[in-house]
Amino acid sequence: MLFRFWVFPDCTFLDISKRILLSDDNEGFSTLLLESLHEHGGFHVFHAREEHEVMETIQCHKPHILLLDDMLPHKGGFHVLRQLQERGHRLSTILMTVLPTQKIVRDATELGASYVFPKPFSSQAMIEKIQELLKRAPPTKH
């Protein structure tokens, strides 16, 4: 089954519940996770590969949760977390990392990440964490 995810270059806002933004530059990983989040979690998923795409997608589509890779090209996921914090965004964010050291967890939390998720992980575990965040998340400011 070919997976489709939503790309609206004209910044069309969709009033869809459970909007997720996945930011990861690994195409294979992203495709598998996107498929699983949509098919098994029932989420509407947007995908961004680089920092500037993340910020544009947040502004346009107002996702409920950001799944953010710490190793994005150029400046990385921590740069995105700093930008979100500086701009006053309060978006539930799950930082995904292959190296969940105490320092990474501390730094991510200080920059506003809701949770640090070690890679690799099962998509079911991610779906459960997203559902948990959606239940307890206050309204987000975008």
Q: What is each PLM-predicted segment?
A:
Residues E56, F78-H89:
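Short amphipathic alpha-helix used as the core "switch/output" element in two-component signaling
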Residues E50, G76-H79:
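Acidic catalytic/metal-coordinating carboxylates
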Residues M1-R19, F29, Q124-H142:
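Non-catalytic signal-transmission and effector/linker regions of two-component phosphorelay proteins
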Residues H79, P100-Y115:
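Alpha4 helix (beta4-alpha4-beta5 surface) of REC/receiver domains from two-component response regulators
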